UniProtKB/Swiss-Prot annotation:
Species per Swiss-Prot/TrEMBL record: Rattus norvegicus
Gene symbol of the encoding locus: Akap8
Modified residues (Phosphothreonine): T553
Protein name per the record: A-kinase anchor protein 8
Molecular function in Gene Ontology: DNA binding; double-stranded DNA binding; histone deacetylase binding; NF-kappaB binding; protein kinase A regulatory subunit binding; zinc ion binding
Numbered residues of crosslink Glycyl lysine isopeptide (Lys-Gly) (interchain with G-Cter in SUMO2): K315, K563
Protein family membership: Belongs to the AKAP95 family.
Length: 687
């Protein structure tokens, strides 16, 4: 038997027929191995009427290739042996589509395995697909022309012999000659691969449950494992010398591969298995600026501005070519170059000036921030003077009832009990008395301030917020242990109180709080002034009767605080005294800030003779400065009588020795105002 091609064949038409119709009898099939693709057919085959792919039409030719079967009468059949193809691919596709229309109208059962008829019922737009020959597998009685010979995972009425799946890399081939698979795939790829869709070759890497098969690949009856393994169009894949496919053969929907990219077809035939990128995607690549300049001739070349010296060189070269070079041109060029050099120096100087201005601005910002810190610190200290507080428990409140409840609470007593395990009982009792006495003095100070000036109404934080902002005023509780805000509802509060996380965090916070309270108590007792008071308390005396100054020492404020010079201490104390602690409490912190700024400017060691002509005023300032400096530096004052002696002893040696004493000269302060501030300083605690 001669060389055969398993792609084209002839169909019996029953009686003599010159129209090339197809018979429906299964027994009328002749093996397709008798038809040679390049040579004449066997003489045992009756004469038929072959249809050619010529450019004229589908008219029957006079070629005689023999009968279909032995003993049968001579008849005209349609042979699909292609003649030398001189037409372009579009005309061939049009003729194939015309034949497919004829087949879809007749609808005979001849085992025709072309998938174009099946696609005719689904979508008429897909009938413009490459025509595929009949598969060389044995015909089955239940085979219909609307079912392709291969199977997807769709719910077709598959027989027992057509249970192959498209999900694997290779199909479950039922061909009685499986060794012909690779060769048939190669021949089919060369014979019809030129009409195949560019994006079909990407379907072999799909997974069936998630990626639907391409619509353009359904009419093909060839085993997809063979076509895709060979690269979709044969072993070489697509090449540039082949004509482009027809416009109708392109896929109507974009084809996506497993990498999520459109059109993973062959790319110049260089990538195996058809995994290269589609050629239609080349113009979709992002074009970056300067990317095209990289090449063998210009590697990494960037666009540069012309340097300053190129302009006179160019002018000189042009003058040489013209032959009229003169000294004036050279002088002009030199002047231009000099001007450009001076311009460059000016730019450099300007940049330096800008850097200097930025540095000056940074210094101004630093000074401004430092002033703001001082204002905030003064405001906080002024607020602390009129705020009830328990230093050991770190409890603060502006309400007298709340501090009284705290001093009688279980939490406060447990804290003192824990401190008593580390310190003597008498010392713990002294701490309790000290806290109570301090809060009494704070209450007295608050009453005095309220008598002087009536409290200003508190500004409403919700002022200017309307209903269009959808704000609502609510009450909430802040859990310090869990750092959470809980709406003030009984059910929500109880739920949080009985939660496991809250109980765990509460126990941890209580342990940490006890350790902190012990540290604060030790810091308070380490103060020299408190030590003197503790000694009197242990002797049975009352250190809180007729006390000149109430010196509150907070452990957390003493820790890590930098030591200040006497001049700075005096300036801060005088500023606090002048503000009278009233304006800062009511939110008017600007006057205090102004006084602090004035004091900061004039602070420094000043001789007593330069303070003023009035000796009485200088004496008052001298006594006030020495007193406040000694009080603020770690609370070195003694009791009321000892404090007066200390002031006299400190003032006399300073005046006798003539050493510079820090005195602050504040203009605009009269003698009666100084006396008033001196009286207030005795009742105002400093920190």
């Amino acid at each position: 038997m001669e060389q055969s091609y398993g792609g084209y064949g002839a169909w019996s038409a029953g009686p003599a027929n010159t129209q090339g119709t197809y018979g429906s009898g299964v027994a009328s099939w002749q093996g397709y191995e008798n038809y040679s693709y390049y040579n004449a057919q066997n003489t045992s085959v009756p004469t038929g009427t072959p249809y050619s792919y010529g450019p004229a039409s589908w008219e029957a030719t006079k070629a005689s290739d023999g009968g279909l079967a032995a003993g049968s009468s001579a008849m005209h059949v349609a042979s699909f042996a292609p003649e030398p193809c001189t037409d372009n691919s579009d005309s061939l596709i049009a003729k194939i589509n015309q034949r497919l229309d004829m087949l879809s109208k007749e609808g005979g059962r001849g085992g025709i395995s072309s998938g174009g008829e099946g696609m005719q019922d689904r979508d008429s737009s897909f009938r413009f697909q490459p025509y595929e020959s009949y598969d060389s597998r044995p015909c089955m009685p239940e085979h219909t022309p609307y079912r392709p010979s291969y199977s997807y995972d769709y719910d077709f009425d598959l027989g027992t012999d057509r249970n192959g799946s498209f999900g694997g890399t290779f199909n479950d081939c039922r061909d009685p000659t499986p060794e012909r698979g690779a060769l048939d795939g190669f021949l089919r790829g060369r014979g019809q691969g030129r009409f195949q869709d560019r994006s079909n070759s990407s379907t072999f890497i799909r997974s069936d449950p998630f990626m639907p098969p391409s619509a353009s690949s359904e009419p093909l009856s060839t085993t997809w494992s063979e076509l895709n393994y060979m690269g979709g169009r044969g072993l070489g894949g697509p090449s540039t010398n082949r004509p482009p496919p027809s416009l109708f053969s392109q896929s109507m929907a974009p084809d996506y591969s497993m990498m999520g990219m459109q059109g993973v077809g062959g790319f110049g035939g260089t990538m195996p298995y058809g995994c290269g990128r589609s050629q239609t995607r080349i113009r979709d690549w992002p074009r970056r600026r300067g990317f095209e300049r990289f090449g063998p001739d210009n590697m990494g070349r960037k666009r540069k501005p012309f340097p300053l010296y190129e302009e006179p060189d160019a002018k000189l070269a042009r003058a040489d070519s013209e032959g009229d070079l003169s000294e004036n041109d050279d002088g002009a060029g030199d002047l231009r170059s000099g001007d450009e050099e001076f311009r460059g120096e000016d730019d450099l100087c300007d940049s330096r000036k800008q850097r200097g201005e930025k540095e000056d601005e940074d210094e101004d910002v630093k000074k401004r921030r430092e002033k703001q810190r001082r204002r905030d610190r003064m405001r906080d200290r002024a607020a602390d003077r009129i705020q009830f507080a328990c230093s050991v428990c770190k409890f603060r409140s502006f309400e007298d009832e709340e501090i009284q409840k705290h001093l009688q609470s279980k939490f406060h007593k447990e804290t003192l009990r824990f401190i008593s395990t580390k310190l003597p009982d008498k010392t713990v009792e002294f701490l309790q008395e000290y806290i109570i006495n301090r809060n009494k003095k704070i209450e007295k100070r608050r009453q005095e301030l309220l008598e002087k000036e009536s409290p200003k109404p508190k500004p409403d934080p919700f002022k200017g917020i309307g209903q269009e902002h959808f704000f609502k005023r609510i009450e909430a509780a802040h859990c310090l242990a869990c750092d959470m805000l809980i709406p003030a509802q009984h059910q929500l509060l109880q739920r949080h109180l009985h939660s496991v996380d809250h109980n765990h965090n509460r126990r941890l916070a209580a342990e940490q709080f006890k350790k902190t309270s012990l540290h604060v108590a030790k810091s308070v007792l380490n103060n020299k002034h408190i030590v003197k008071m503790l000694e009197k308390y242990l002797k049975g005396e009352d250190p809180f009767v007729n006390e000149t100054a109430d010196l509150e020492t907070e452990g957390d404020e003493n820790l890590g605080e930098e030591k200040e010079t006497p001049e700075e201490v005096a300036a801060e104390v005088l500023a606090e005294v002048i503000t009278a602690a009233v304006k800062a409490v009511e939110g008017d912190g600007e006057p205090a800030a102004e006084h602090s700024d004035v004091l900061a400017e004039v602070e420094g060691p000043v001789d007593t003779a330069e303070a003023g002509s009035d000796s009485h005023t200088g004496k008052l300032l001298e006594e006030q400065t020495c007193e406040t400096a000694s009080e603020t530096r770690n609370m070195e004052d003694m009791a009321r009588g000892e404090a007066a002696e200390a002031r006299n002893e400190a003032a006399v040696p300073a005046a006798a020795a003539g050493s510079p004493v820090p005195v602050i000269a504040i203009p605009g302060i009269l003698e009666d105002e100084l006396e008033q501030t001196d009286a207030e300083a005795k009742d105002t605690p400093t920190e």
